[in-house]
């Protein structure tokens, strides 16, 4: 008997009967299918090719999900981090409890993916947020969505998953997004007051 056998280093993981365990590759494939499900078959194939070739494809908003566009200045003020440092990404993951966020480094923006209903159910908040350059992209908008494995800032790609989408239909909770916006607005106001 080897020392590995006696120490249990290679023992199989025991699961409870009836528990189905999905591999990361299975979750990623299911998430890709979910993201592309708003497209026709022909457009779906073109989107897959764009992901492979360019690392990004445009997907329609307002059916499966919408996106709240957040200026980097507001996100950085709310989190206290530095843009593109990785710490903001980590903090967003905590704040949104793993809800997916896309970062557009060139545009200095983040996109929190939220339920498709947000533009209809939060109209007053959205009107208030526009003064702070926050916009909700619903029906009629398209969002450039990176390939699921692009999870770090890389000059080779236009955008990346600041907080990766862990599985299909997992989205940010609108209330958590609203709280981040409120914290960012407050922090920016405090900075402006201190600069006077």
Task: Please name every model-derived segment.
Residues 121-124, 128-133:
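Active-site-proximal loop/helix of nucleotide/amide-processing enzymes and allied scaffolds
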Residues 130-148:
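Conserved short beta-strand edge segments in small beta-sheet-based binding/regulatory domains
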Residues 1-106, 116-119, 124, 138, ...:
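Signature for HUH/AEP ssDNA processing cores
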């Amino acid at each position: 008997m080897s020392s590995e056998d006696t120490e249990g280093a290679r023992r199989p993981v025991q699961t409870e009967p009836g528990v189905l365990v999905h591999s990361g590759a299975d979750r990623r494939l299911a998430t890709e299918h979910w993201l592309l499900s708003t497209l026709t078959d022909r457009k779906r194939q073109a989107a897959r090719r764009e992901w492979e070739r360019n690392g990004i494809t445009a997907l329609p908003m307002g059916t499966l999900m919408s996106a709240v566009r957040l200026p980097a200045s507001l996100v950085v003020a709310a989190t206290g981090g530095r843009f593109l440092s990785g710490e903001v990404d980590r903090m967003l993951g905590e704040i949104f409890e793993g809800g997916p966020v896309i970062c557009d480094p060139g545009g200095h923006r983040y996109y929190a993916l939220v339920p498709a209903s947000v533009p209809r159910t939060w109209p007053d908040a959205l009107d208030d947020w526009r003064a702070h350059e926050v916009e909700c992209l619903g029906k009629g908008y398209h969002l450039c969505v990176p390939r699921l494995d692009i999870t770090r800032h890389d000059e080779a790609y236009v955008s990346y998953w600041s907080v990766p989408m862990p599985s299909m239909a997992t989205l940010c909770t609108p209330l958590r997004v609203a709280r981040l916006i409120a914290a960012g607005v407050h922090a920016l106001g405090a900075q402006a007051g201190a600069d006077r």
